[in-house]
């Protein structure tokens, strides 16, 4: 699918400080690894995952998303008052209702008439949200 009037202006992210590496996990599982005769480094080799990151307990997805949104907005000249839609594509939500996107919308001080909603579809939620907005622009 190709879009004619759509492009990605900016991306933002916010990584948690708590890091647990595959090596850390393997050290914790050392006795099990020995019993099973598994070589050290097996976890990363099999999964391709070098590290995992975790937020502190009590941190809400909207807080992290708002920081990522500010990061993205800080890298562009787009006036936030011209943003007409915000979709939260995360699996994680603050609550069942209201939509997590509504909290992010408030935190980012977007226009009151901007469309806001959540799309949750595992790893594809973000991509689904991007395609949905692109269709709203181009179709």
Where are these regions (language model features)?
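Short glycine-rich or small-residue beta-strand-to-loop segments that form or flank ligand, phosphate
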Residues: 85-91
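Conserved "HGTGT" condensation-loop signature of ketosynthase/thiolase-family condensing enzymes
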Residues: 1-84, 106-108
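Conserved catalytic cysteine-centered active-site region
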Residues: 41-46, 50-62, 91-139
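Short beta-strand segments
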Residues: 9-12, 89, 120
């Amino acid at each position: 699918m190709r879009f004619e009037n759509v492009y990605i202006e900016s991306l933002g992210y916010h990584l948690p400080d708590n890091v647990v590496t595959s090596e850390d996990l393997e050290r914790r599982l050392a006795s099990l690894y020995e019993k099973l005769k598994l070589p050290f480094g097996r976890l990363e080799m099999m999964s391709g995952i070098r590290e995992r990151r975790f937020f502190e307990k009590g941190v809400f997805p909207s807080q992290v998303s708002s920081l990522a949104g500010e990061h993205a907005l800080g890298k562009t000249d787009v006036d936030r008052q011209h943003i007409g839609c915000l979709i939260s594509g995360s699996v994680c939500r603050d609550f069942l209702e209201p939509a997590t996107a509504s909290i992010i919308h408030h935190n980012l001080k977007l226009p009151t008439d901007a469309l806001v909603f959540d799309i949750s579809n595992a790893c594809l939620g973000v991509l689904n949200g991007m395609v949905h907005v692109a269709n709203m622009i181009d179709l």
